[in-house]
Each structure stands twice: as structure tokens, then as C-alpha cells.
């Protein structure tokens, strides 16, 4: 029977595997490995229903406890967290399911506290539970094991922003070390903006031009207004084509030019921006994980600005200034590490929300 199951698994015939296991084993005598496999098959089968997903979570939980913190326990725990994350907001029992994950996670801590995989899955668990202190603790554990890198440095900064318990001095000192990891890409030399030109090209770079993201409510009218002036507007999306949606399409038509770079390398993005001869490049994502902010460690355009998506300094030397006002930057200005241009009234331009979000 095991050989048959193996062949079915290779053929990805998950429904057949479920039938085979249930026909030849009972809940009582079924070993942890088969419970875990049942969970994987229920979660992976085509046409999976909410009921299938809940059964899969139950199988992972059973496998975890039957294996008594062996390797299968770790596999089942990770699968449980992964499936909870996949279900997302569609699943009404999301929080309850994640609380089960957390219970198992804490029970496994003594055995797996130094295991990188265990720690990594803790990041996802505490992200969805909105337990930011616990998530920061896990990030620091990984950094302690592997050293600081771009991904975990970004996660640490982003999570820390939710807590707001870093002083600006602490933040900028960390960012100085973090920014040393960013590469400098090949770029042609550029000259200053010719203000006398008939058209000045301004580009907005973002990973958030989709899903009714709040960014879109701040820039829609701005883009419309810029089109009435001497500015030529370029939208540069860091998403992949398949990630775009109706929100993207509505935003796309507002720009004079639209470029998708989600599948490009950092060097390719730099090359594209320079070929467009952009005069002013505005980053809308800052240090959030999907933003590709590291390309701003390279001088691509005469003027490079950070605004809106990340309300703090990026600490990168090739960003000329951040846009703010007297309300967003009040104290510790000397610790921002980037010049601050303060608008006289307010730093953003909200367009209003018609629908509840």
C-alpha cells in the first residue's frame, strides 16, 4: 500500500491518496506520518472546500501530538501555520486556527528553539496574530543565527514601526548598518534638471498599485492634476502582471506612461528608469518589504524623493529628501539622516473614500 501511495503522490492524485489511507487505517491506529500526509493531501487537492481545509488542520494537529515533538511534529506545525495563512481572511475561524498553531508552537519551543525553520514559521504566525513583540523576538533570533540581511532587516523595521517604541536615534543607527547591505548598481552619469524644458518627467514607483490599497486614494487626484501642468507622469509598478487588478487598471489610465517591472532584476529596473530619462523619481514604499528601496542607493535621476508609503527616513544617501509637514516630523529631526522638505499645510492629498474598506 505504501508503494501505491507513493505512486499516487508522484502523480498528484491527492483525492485517491485520501481514500486509500482512510480505507486501510482508522483514526486510532493511523500513525503520525499518515495523519500529516492526509493533511497535505486535503490541503492540496483540486476543488478544496472550507471543510477540507478544516479537516486538514485537524490532521496536522493530530500528527503533531502523535509524533511527540519529532520531525513529523515540526512538519505538521509548519503545514498548520502555512494553511492558516493561505486561508487568510476568507476563513471565519482564522484567529481560532492560528491560536491552535500558537499553542503547538509554544509546546515545541523547548525542542526547536534554535531551529531556523521553526523560528521562520514563527514570523508568519505572529504576523497574522498581530503579536509584534513576539515577531520582533523571532526576527532577532534569526539575525543572531544568520546575521543581518535585507529580508530580515526589512521585517524588523516594518514590525518595529507598528510598536512605535524605537526612538528616531535608535532607528537611524540601525538603518545606517542596514543600508550597508544595499548594492550600488551601474548607472550613467546624469545632469541637473533643466527647469526650462517643456516637459519634466516625474515617476512614481510602488508595489501597491492594486487591491484598493490606501496609496491609490492619495495619488489619484495628484496624478490628474499633474497632467494639467508641464509634468509628464510615469507609473512604475513593482508588481507582476498577474497581480494587477481592477484598481490597477483604473490607476493605470491616469498616467502618461505605465511600466511593469515586477519580474525585473534591480539592475534592469535602474536601466529602465534611466532609459525613460526620468527627472524626478518618487518612491512610495520606503522600507516595506516589497518596495525594492535598495535601488535608491544608486543615483538614477537628478532628483530622488521618498514620500507617502513609509513615513520616515530610509537613511539612503541617494534619496535627496522626504516629503513631510510640521505634524509628521516634530522632534528628533536631526536623527532623520535625510533632508526633510516640509509642506506648509499637510503632506498628503487624500482623495476621499466612497466605499467602506
Features from the language model and the residues they span:
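Alpha-helical solenoid repeat scaffolds of the TPR/TPR-like class and their adjacent stem/linker regions
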Residues: 1-357
Amino acid at each position: 500500500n505504501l508503494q501505491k501511495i507513493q505512486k499516487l503522490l508522484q502523480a498528484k492524485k491527492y483525492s485517491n491518496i485520501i481514500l486509500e489511507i482512510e480505507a486501510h487505517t482508522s483514526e486510532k491506529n493511523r500513525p503520525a506520518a499518515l495523519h500529516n500526509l492526509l493533511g497535505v493531501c486535503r490541503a492540496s487537492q483540486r476543488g478544496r472546500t472550507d471543510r477540507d481545509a478544516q479537516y486538514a488542520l485537524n490532521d496536522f494537529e493530530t500528527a503533531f501530538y502523535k509524533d511527540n515533538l519529532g520531525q513529523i511534529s515540526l512538519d505538521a506545525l509548519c503545514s498548520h501555520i502555512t494553511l492558516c495563512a493561505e486561508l487568510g481572511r476568507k476563513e471565519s475561524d482564522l484567529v481560532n486556527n492560528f491560536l491552535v498553531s500558537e499553542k503547538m508552537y509554544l509546546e515545541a519551543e523547548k525542542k526547536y528553539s534554535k531551529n531556523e525553520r521553526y523560528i521562520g514559521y514563527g514570523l508568519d504566525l505572529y504576523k497574522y496574530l498581530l503579536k509584534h513583540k513576539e515577531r520582533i523576538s523571532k526576527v532577532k533570533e534569526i539575525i543572531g543565527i544568520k546575521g543581518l540581511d535585507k529580508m530580515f532587516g526589512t521585517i524588523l523595521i516594518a514590525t518595529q514601526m507598528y510598536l512605535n517604541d524605537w526612538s528616531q536615534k535608535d532607528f537611524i543607527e540601525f538603518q545606517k548598518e542596514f543600508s550597508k547591505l544595499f548594492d550600488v548598481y551601474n548607472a550613467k552619469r546624469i545632469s541637473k534638471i533643466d527647469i526650462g524644458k517643456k516637459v519634466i518627467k516625474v515617476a512614481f514607483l510602488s508595489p501597491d498599485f492594486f487591491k484598493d490599497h490606501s496609496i491609490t486614494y492619495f495619488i489619484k487626484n495628484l496624478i490628474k492634476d499633474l497632467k494639467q501642468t508641464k509634468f509628464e507622469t510615469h507609473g512604475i509598478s513593482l508588481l507582476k502582471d498577474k497581480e494587477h487588478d481592477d484598481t490597477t487598471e483604473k490607476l493605470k489610465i491616469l498616467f502618461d506612461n505605465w511600466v511593469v517591472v515586477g519580474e525585473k532584476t534591480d539592475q534592469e529596473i535602474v536601466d529602465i528608469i534611466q532609459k525613460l530619462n526620468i527627472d524626478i523619481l518618487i518612491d512610495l514604499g520606503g522600507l516595506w518589504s516589497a518596495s525594492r528601496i535598495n535601488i535608491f542607493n544608486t543615483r538614477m535621476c537628478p532628483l530622488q524623493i521618498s514620500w507617502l508609503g513609509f513615513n520616515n527616513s530610509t537613511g539612503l544617501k541617494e534619496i535627496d529628501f522626504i516629503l513631510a509637514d510640521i505634524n509628521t516630523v516634530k522632534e528628533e529631526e536631526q536623527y532623520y539622516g535625510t533632508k526633510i522638505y516640509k509642506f506648509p499645510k499637510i503632506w498628503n492629498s487624500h482623495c476621499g473614500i466612497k466605499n467602506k474598506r
